[in-house]
């Protein structure tokens, strides 16, 4: 609701919540539907008012906030890698100057998926000691020693400072869940449009990507459906005006439909087509981004 919007007033917005402990009492939920400036001290506001039971998330209707995690969805979703040092990120040209067999992977963050990929790579020395890195990959060792260690030397966390050649978080759960998969599903944690896509298993995901250890296009189709998107908007959170995909409340609580084999096959086929079509169009038109694609789609709808 707008604060006083005059010359001597504060140009801010506030949210006020007043309640009392009574599980059976009817609450009132008023939502701003329109604002108009008629030259007075503030804005004239139109409200849409509903009366009913208010849940913990200050919403009425289905109590989405009370949904619990489903056992079937456990151990599947994880955040991407938290590297803790820009020195691990290198260009293809820089990678070419290091050992050909060094553990270097293609790297994608949220902007790479929604915008145009930077084409960068990531040094990932997980599972190796510093001595093993120095003996097997001396050039890579020197690169990380010069570009990561100086910053890590000032880190207050002993484990991060002492294991300077490794990423800040090892993400062992993520690595174990993706092991053996040819591809996995990823979505950007905070994004204007909720888009799910397949990433090749060779691609290292950034911490701002939510990764699902599933390679079945039937799952991709369900997650891309309007039903799941509606669930995400109700169960997730927001950052400014952008929805945030919280894996614990958006994925782990989501009840997948009990589809028949024929329905699964149809959804699987459509999802493969969708994923391939988007990637094909972006390959044919390098300036085309997923955000731009879905902005146009939103206008058409």
Q: Predicted regions span which residues?
A:
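S-adenosyl-L-methionine
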Residues: 1-14, 38, 42, 48-301
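Conserved beta strand-loop-helix elements of the APE1-like EEP
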Residues: 11-26
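Sec-type signal peptide cleavage vicinity
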Residues: 23, 34-36
